[in-house]
């Protein structure tokens, strides 16, 4: 079939990396992952992080998650593509004392997965 004639998957394996997956129609799906920049939760600031490589045409999605389950608080964030090579994030960090949630002014770093082509 057609899949047998497609080029091999290429990319970089590592803490920050990417994979280019050949698709039909001479297109490539690109998946990227890594650790984004550190946000100061509660500051209201929007932070910009860079991808390992720029997407050639479309930066479709980015997903983030707090990367430290041992931390005293849990970070929550939102992210959006900004350019073909960057995305923006904003964060909030919460801690729990009994049944009370407290917002913290603290650093939050994220791991991300980005999808584009």
Regions found by a protein language model. Name each.
Residues 1-17, 48-53:
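Fibrous stalk/shaft segments of extracellular and virion attachment machinery
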Residues 16-35:
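GGW-centered surface loops in extracellular recognition modules
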Residues 29-117:
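Extracellular attachment/recognition segments
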